[in-house]
């Protein structure tokens, strides 16, 4: 199964053709920052934007080496977002900890996701419930959720990888997609929905169309966005109706039982700990009764899938390829298997939250894969919303109101000055405290200068040294105040998947690792690859 579906390809091609026909001949807006990717030619911005569909990540690396390593921001053309200012690593922490009144993330994400076109109900798509569920509820309940998720993932492996002792080939992307989706929905809605193949497939398809459709809408001229947006909305509506058909009975029953429990506290029913219940409880707590209906709750459930499935599935797939394509002589597999088998035995053959915390080498192997194979070449998009802009004169940083910024994630991750032998997969890299400290020092060091936003300096800003943690040793989960709220659950699920594989399966070394394809800022597994596996005799 390819990440780019036929529909996604059609939508992207349509946006490009319409852009060629209707984009005006534009030139870049004046800026103090150097530009990378433009040529001296007619319709330079349009033509640069079109080339960015396959050259953006190359330009990001070019600009990083030429400018960012000297702490100079630079500007890239982008088909889906227009000019983007790329921020050097040493300036990132200062910028990304600015208050939301200076640097916006919510409206930027809504623009990236094209919420106004792809969501039939704007309120749940634009409020903070997704982040509240991920950050507050799931993270808070990880200790109780981990054994349940582990059990479901083990069942998924039995189903998709099998229990045969003979070697067999499996499609990496397809199996990762199914296993990850089932594991996520164990937390979101529980059984039986987390095992409903039609429900899970519709969630997968919806998340794919959402990503591809949003990119196509962003790339189209404003005048024509309603056409592409209408097409994407129509397909998303069909897929949503499919998921709702499978989930509405569960949601309806939950609404009825919750109402009965609220009316009569002695009612004999214990609410499940899952996202459906957290959504219902949150709507009651906020007195948001207009959203307390089956359709809206089903839609909120789908949105949680949309933000979870694609990136986690991608990360699991690249983890398996990076690990099993590494030279066996390096001893990664032996060390990882010994660690997982030891912890699994000590925990009585049950994966618990405390057991997973002991998997230090396993966590390092996962983080190293996230470093080596980021979801995008650039990321962490934000928009300057301070009317006076943001400036750092000593470093020629001048960001007017409305400027879109991003970070050169892949370029930083492949910088040998930060990560020695950066092109190599080293499963032990993040298990070495001294190596992690050195990475933190490189990424968190700040220039001795103040950022000006036309007002008082942000008093909540703290020194990098006092607030640094391992999540800032690399940028897979972001940086600053809006770091990924679901990162703890992602690490739990990825640890479980890798540990279950190492304990229960043999995997032949991967001789050919498919290269990720650049599609704008995304890294796309066009050819997902295969693994040859068999169930271990233990």
UniProtKB/Swiss-Prot annotation:
| Pfam families named among the record's database cross-references | p450
Q: Provide the cofactor list for this protein.
A: heme
TM segments? 3-23
Q: Which residues make up the binding site for heme?
A: 484
Q: Which domain of life is it from?
A: Eukaryota
From the UniProt record, list the reaction(s) this protein catalyses: 12-deshydroxyl okaramine E + 2 reduced [NADPH--hemoprotein reductase] + 2 O2 = 3-desmethyl okaramine B + 2 oxidized [NADPH--hemoprotein reductase] + 2 H2O + 2 H(+)
Q: In which pathway does it act?
A: Alkaloid biosynthesis
Reported phenotype of the disruption mutant: Abolishes the production of okaramine B and leads to the accumulation of okaramine E and 12-deshydroxy okaramine E.
UniProt keywords (A-Z) are: Heme, Iron, Membrane, Metal-binding, Monooxygenase, Oxidoreductase, Transmembrane, Transmembrane helix
What are this entry's molecular-function GO terms?
heme binding; iron ion binding; monooxygenase activity; oxidoreductase activity, acting on paired donors, with incorporation or reduction of molecular oxygen
Which GO BP terms sit in this record?
Answer: mycotoxin biosynthetic process
Question: Which EC numbers characterise this protein's activity in its record?
Answer: 1.14.14.-
The enzyme class is oxidoreductase
Where is it located?
A: Membrane
Q: Give the membrane topology.
A: Single-pass membrane protein
> GO cellular-component terms in the record?
membrane
Q: Which family does it belong to?
A: Belongs to the cytochrome P450 family.
Concerning PANTHER family, the annotation shows: CYTOCHROME P450, P450, PUTATIVE (EUROFUNG)-RELATED
| Job description of the protein | Nonribosomal peptide synthetase; part of the gene cluster that mediates the biosynthesis of okaramine B, a prenylated indole alkaloid that possesses an unusual octacyclic ring system, including a four-membered azetidine ring and an eight-membered azocine ring, and that exhibits insecticidal activity against silkworm larvae. Within the pathway, okaG acts as a 2,3-diol synthase that installs 2,3-diol on the okaramine scaffold to convert 12-deshydroxyl okaramine E into 3-desmethyl okaramine B.
Q: What is this protein called?
A: Cytochrome P450 monooxygenase okaG
What is the originating organism of this protein?
Penicillium ochrochloron
Gene giving rise to this polypeptide: okaG
């Amino acid at each position: 199964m390819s990440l780019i579906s036929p529909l996604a390809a059609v939508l992207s091609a349509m946006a490009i053709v319409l852009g060629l026909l209707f984009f005006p001949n534009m030139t870049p807006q004046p800026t103090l920052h150097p530009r990378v990717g433009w040529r001296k030619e007619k319709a330079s911005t349009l033509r640069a934007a079109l080339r960015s569909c396959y050259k953006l990540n190359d330009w990001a690396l070019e600009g990083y080496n030429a400018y960012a390593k000297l702490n100079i921001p630079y500007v890239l053309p982008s088909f889906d977002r227009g000019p983007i200012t790329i921020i050097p690593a040493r300036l990132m922490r200062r910028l990304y900890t600015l208050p939301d009144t200076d640097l916006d993330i919510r409206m930027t994400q809504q623009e990236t996701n094209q919420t106004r076109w792809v969501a039939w109900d704007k309120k749940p798509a634009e409020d903070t419930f997704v982040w509240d569920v991920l950050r507050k509820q799931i993270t808070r309940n990880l200790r109780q959720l981990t054994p349940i998720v582990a059990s479901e993932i083990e069942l998924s492996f039995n189903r998709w990888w099998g229990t045969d002792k003979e070697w067999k080939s499996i499609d990496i992307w397809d199996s990762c997609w199914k296993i990850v989706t089932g594991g996520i929905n164990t937390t979101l809605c529980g059984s039986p929905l987390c095992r409903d193949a039609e429900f899970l497939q519709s969630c997968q398809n919806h998340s794919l169309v959402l990503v591809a459709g949003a990119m196509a809408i962003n790339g189209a001229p404003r005048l024509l966005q309603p056409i592409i947006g209408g097409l994407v909305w129509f397909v998303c509506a069909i897929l949503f109706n499919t998921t709702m058909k499978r989930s509405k009975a569960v949601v309806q029953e939950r609404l009825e039982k919750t109402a009965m429990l609220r009316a009569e506290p002695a009612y004999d029913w214990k609410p499940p700990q899952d996202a459906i219940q957290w959504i219902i409880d949150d709507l009651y707590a906020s007195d948001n009764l207009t959203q307390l209906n089956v359709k809206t709750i089903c839609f909120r459930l789908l949105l949680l899938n949309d933000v979870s499935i694609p990136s986690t599935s991608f990360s699991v797939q690249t983890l398996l390829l990076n690990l099993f394509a590494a030279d066996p002589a390096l001893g990664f597999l032996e060390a990882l298997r010994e660690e997982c088998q030891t912890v699994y035995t000590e925990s009585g053959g049950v994966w618990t939250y405390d057991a997973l915390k002991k998997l230090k080498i396993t966590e390092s192997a996962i983080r190293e894969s996230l470093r080596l194979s980021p979801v995008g070449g650039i990321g962490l998009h934000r928009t300057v919303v301070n009317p006076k802009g943001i400036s750092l004169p000593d470093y020629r940083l001048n960001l007017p109101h409305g400027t879109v910024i991003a970070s050169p994630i892949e370029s930083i991750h492949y910088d040998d000055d930060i990560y020695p032998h950066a092109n190599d997969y080293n499963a032990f890299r993040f298990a070495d405290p001294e190596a992690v400290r050195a990475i933190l020092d490189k990424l968190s060091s700040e220039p001795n200068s103040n950022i000006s936003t036309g007002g008082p300096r942000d008093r909540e800003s703290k020194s990098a040294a006092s607030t640094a943690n391992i999540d800032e040793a690399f940028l897979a989960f972001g940086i600053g105040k809006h770091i990924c709220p679901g990162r703890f659950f992602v690490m739990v699920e990825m640890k479980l998947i890798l540990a279950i594989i190492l304990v229960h399966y043999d995997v032949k070394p991967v001789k050919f690792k498919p290269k990720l394809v650049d599609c704008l800022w995304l890294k796309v597994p066009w050819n997902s690859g295969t693994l040859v596996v068999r169930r271990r005799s233990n």
